[in-house]
Curated annotation (Swiss-Prot):
Species whose genome carries this gene: Escherichia coli O17:K52:H18 (strain UMN026 / ExPEC)
Annotated function: Catalyzes the formation of phosphodiester linkages between 5'-phosphoryl and 3'-hydroxyl groups in double-stranded DNA using NAD as a coenzyme and as the energy source for the reaction.
GO MF entry, a single one: DNA ligase (NAD+) activity
PROSITE patterns according to UniProt: DNA_LIGASE_N1, DNA_LIGASE_N2
EC supergroup of this enzyme: ligase
Protein name: DNA ligase B
Highest taxon of source: Bacteria
Length: 560
């Protein structure tokens, strides 16, 4: 019962998310956006299938194709799930290529597996599909996948690939095999190295007119033997004996989705001889080959890896002012998952950097995780037809502005509060940006230290602050009064590192105000430029006013 409930919840969540990502476009706008992306994908298809080149990463192509399908569903212009590649060859496949249906997640895979037995998992090798036809023990023909029914004659090319056996015997002497021509790799770790655009590279090599030695950089992984031995173990043994050893090495029996998940995760992290983009689970029992048709395979499914980088739609562009007054640009995204992390925002950087990227709401950007799991922009992969970019705020802020609240200072003022509450400054646990905004909106702070005057009753009656949390906050605010003098000076934004400030041995506000530029310049890591900044800072009227206010509050080091 619990399993079926989990499946139902998964389906409902998927449906909800599917509807949620439908753009709020007029019919005319939808038609224009869909048409433009259709034309681009068609151009990429023509480049790939006819010329063997790719102007776009495989993962980006796959995700934008899925995005196009989603838009078509949203606006009633849905096309069949299986998109047939353009016909660019007249050689008929002895057995049609069926393609493989993708499973959304482990729950969907588990549901599919419950109805089947004698199941096996293989890596979903990333390359180009091929048919190998053997007659009387010799390689008779090699055919590109094409549209699944017909393809190009690749016989001469494949004969130059040393990894493909040219002669076979026994049951394989008169057989038709289907597999993947792949780019041979040494110790490829998918988790670290990604897809390296392997599919397009293989297609390019196979499309070249010259019979280059580079074809020996290709290998083959046979994943189907239509009308072959009934037992999978017999199939694998015969294939290995003939020279198709990879199939036996990388085909494992599985009983449930948990076992598939373990193998999938192991291959994701292991050193493999090829690039992969997931796993394929297949039943050993297959229908007769005469029943195989494109898009009709019910005996196998794929469970793809989550891409290292995801295509995300930009919903809004927002501007943030940091404590130093610098304006940064943040893109709010339609949520995507990256390595089990839900990503909804990505920092673009400065206004100039944003203008160089030329990013507007509605654009599609490629996002990945940098060090420490921080989202980053890798590329702008698609720009919308209608592009309206917001106007950035005037650059009127600097490191000495917005210690006191005002309408124009809202963002920098909040940034200063977030900074002073951080662990490395006053260590106010339990309050972040949202909490500071709630306090300031309710109590209208005069300056960055006004929170010291809040009473337990005021905190308890602050909308957005839970009553159970208000007592904890009041306790934190009181503890802050006992923080060392240097922590309070850091909270005031002195332009020095903590190491330099500690080395100064300043222990009172009056002593600090008397220190000269020469004194500051001799501190570690503090040059003449930084020393002048310290002088400008301590002579600033807002800073002097804050120092006097803290003295009135009898904060350590500020007392007269």
């Amino acid at each position: 019962m619990k399993v079926w409930m989990a499946i139902l919840i998964s389906i409902l969540c998927w449906q909800s998310s599917a509807w949620a990502v439908c753009p709020a476009w007029s019919p005319a706008r939808a038609q224009e956006e869909i048409s433009r992306l259709q034309q681009q994908i068609k151009q990429w298809d023509d480049d790939y299938w006819k010329e063997g080149k790719s102007e776009v990463e495989d993962g980006v192509y796959d995700q934008l194709s899925a995005r196009l399908t989603q838009w078509q569903r949203c606006f009633g212009n849905e096309t069949p799930d299986v998109m047939m590649p353009p016909l660019n060859g007249a050689v008929i496949h002895p057995v049609a290529h069926t393609g493989v249906r993708k499973m959304a997640d482990k729950i969907a895979l588990s549901l599919w597996m419950r109805e089947r037995s004698d199941l096996w998992v293989q890596p979903k090798v990333d390359g180009v599909a091929v048919t190998l036809v053997y007659r009387d023990g010799k390689l008779n023909k090699a055919i590109s996948r094409g549209n699944g029914l017909k393809g190009e004659d690749w016989t001469q090319k494949v004969r130059l690939i040393s990894a493909v056996p040219q002669t076979v015997s026994g049951p394989l002497a008169n057989s038709t095999l289907q597999g993947e021509i792949f780019l041979k790799r040494e110790g490829h770790i998918q988790q670290q190295m990604g897809g390296i655009n392997a599919r397009a590279k293989v297609a390019g090599l196979m499309m070249r007119q010259d019979d280059s030695d580079t074809l020996n950089s290709l290998g083959v992984f046979v994943w189907a033997w239509p009308d072959g031995p009934q037992l999978m173990t017999d199939r694998l043994k015969e294939l290995a004996t003939a020279g198709f050893t990879l199939t036996q090495t990388y085909t494992r029996a599985v009983k449930n989705a948990d076992e598939v998940a373990r193998v999938r995760n192991a291959w994701w992290k292991a050193k493999l001889p090829f690039v992969t983009d997931g796993v394929v689970v297949r039943a050993a029992k297959e229908p007769e080959s005469r029943h195989w048709l494109p898009g009709q395979a019910e005996w196998l499914v794929a469970w793809k890896y989550q891409p290292v980088a995801q295509v995300a739609e930009v919903k809004t562009i927002q501007f943030a002012v940091g404590k130093s007054g610098k304006i940064s640009v943040v893109a709010s995204l339609a949520p995507v998952m990256l390595d089990d992390k839900k990503v909804q925002r990505v920092n673009i950087g400065s206004v100039r950097r944003w203008q160089e990227w030329d990013i507007a709401p509605g654009d599609q950007i490629l996002v990945s995780l940098a060090g420490q799991g921080i989202p980053r922009i890798d590329d702008v992969v698609w720009r919308g037809a209608e592009r309206t970019k917001p106007t950035p705020p005037e650059n009127r802020f600097n490191s000495l502005t917005c210690y006191f609240a005002s309408d124009v200072c809202q963002e920098q003022f909040i940034s200063r509060l977030v900074w002073l509450g951080s662990k490395q400054v006053l260590g106010l646990d339990g309050i972040g940006e949202a909490g500071w905004r709630a306090l300031h909106q309710t109590h209208r702070f005069e300056h960055i230290f006004s929170w010291l005057l809040l009473t337990p009753e005021q905190l308890q009656n602050t909308p957005g602050i839970a009553k159970s949390k208000s007592a904890q906050l009041w306790h934190q605010f009181n503890l802050a009064r006992k923080q060392p003098f240097t922590r309070w000076v850091m909270a005031m934004g002195i332009p020095l590192t903590r190491a330099a400030l500690n080395a100064s041995d300043e222990r009172s506000w009056s002593q600090l105000l008397l220190s000269t530029e020469q004194f500051w310049q001799q501190l570690p890591g503090t040059g003449s430029g930084r020393a002048r900044q310290v002088i400008e800072w301590k002579e600033n009227a807002q800073i002097k006013k804050l120092g006097s206010w803290l003295a009135a509050q009898q904060i350590t080091g500020f007392e007269p």
